[in-house]
Amino acid sequence: MKFFIDTANLDQIREANELGVLDGVTTNPSLMAKEGIRGVENQRKHYLEICEIVGGDVSAEVIATDLEGMIKEGEELAALHPNIVVKVPCIEAGIKAIKYFTRKGIRTNCTLVFSVGQALLAAKAGATYVSPFVGRLDDIASDGIELVRKIVEMYDYYDYDTQVLAASIRSTQHIIQCVEAGADVATCPLSAIKRSEEGRGGSEC
């Protein structure tokens, strides 16, 4: 299973990369804002800085929620660097955008996935990654890990190429459970990666 770090903090990305186990990065507008990075140009410069640190995929999320806006943003993001993966929300316009990007050879990460049905649509549209939100489902008394397991089983059964990128990881126990469920990738905060290194399997992040 691959490890991605879920942050826009360059120091944390460097620290995770120095461990020698980092395979990529996921970001979103909220994480960018948390680091004080605002404005399209500043965000894009920041994505390039991340790409200089990490050799793997870097998910950069579109802000638009309409199809035309997503396509425009996504094409601009993809043109920044070969490692950029365009992160698109799992809404109707998002699925259409993913299909468009697939035809153009642009890789995508379908985010905000909370059901098997959404994961199926994303895979049929050709998403590179699909991101079920484990912690957020657990927050509403649902079972995020079970969703990961069901998506993995579906993709295996129908031979979809889409990779399952488990997101909203809240503990190292979540990481262990994602491994057991067969997730291709777990994206998590630096604290979870470091606690795994320390062998603290049940610790909260």
Question: Predicted segments — roles?
Answer:
Residues 198-205:
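Conserved small/polar residues in nucleotide/adenosyl-binding loops
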Residues 53, 57, 81, 96-97, ...:
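Conserved anion-binding
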Residues 45, 190-197:
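Charge-dense, low-complexity polyampholytic segments
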Residues 3-5, 9-13, 19-21, 27-100, ...:
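Active-site beta->alpha loop and helix N-cap motifs at the rims of alpha/beta catalytic domains
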Residues 180-193, 203:
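A structured, mid-to-C-terminal "fold-capping" secondary-structure block
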Residues 11-19, 69-73, 97, 115-125, ...:
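Catalytic cores of alpha/beta
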Residues 5-8, 39, 143, 170, ...:
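Catalytic cores of large soluble enzymes that bind and process phosphate-bearing ligands
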